[in-house]
Amino acid sequence: MSKVCQVTGKRRIVGHNVSHANNKTKRLFNPNLHERRFWVESENRWVRLKVSNHGLRVIDKCGIDAVLADIRKRGERV
């Protein structure tokens, strides 16, 4: 599975490692992803999502039902 947050859409970005001598080499910055299960009361089932730490905070703020509706509106299957 890809390294993309299902809630916020955060994904890997490209940057540089910078040495003390200021040499730069390409590297990847990965989002802080976690595979989490959420209980959805309205559907009476568990939903498994790959979310970043920011995505977890969005779920805490808006609620899992609103977040799932947003994900489904984008066309993702949950």
Swiss-Prot record:
Belongs to the bacterial ribosomal protein bL28 family. GO terms for cellular component: cytosolic large ribosomal subunit. InterPro entries: Ribosomal_bL28 (IPR026569), Ribosomal_bL28/bL31-like_sf (IPR034704), Ribosomal_bL28_bact-type (IPR001383), Ribosomal_bL28_sf (IPR037147). It comes from Methylococcus capsulatus (strain ATCC 33009 / NCIMB 11132 / Bath). Coiled coil: none annotated. This is Large ribosomal subunit protein bL28. One of its GO terms (biological process) is translation. The keyword Ribonucleoprotein applies. Keywords: Ribonucleoprotein, Ribosomal protein. GO terms for molecular function: structural constituent of ribosome.
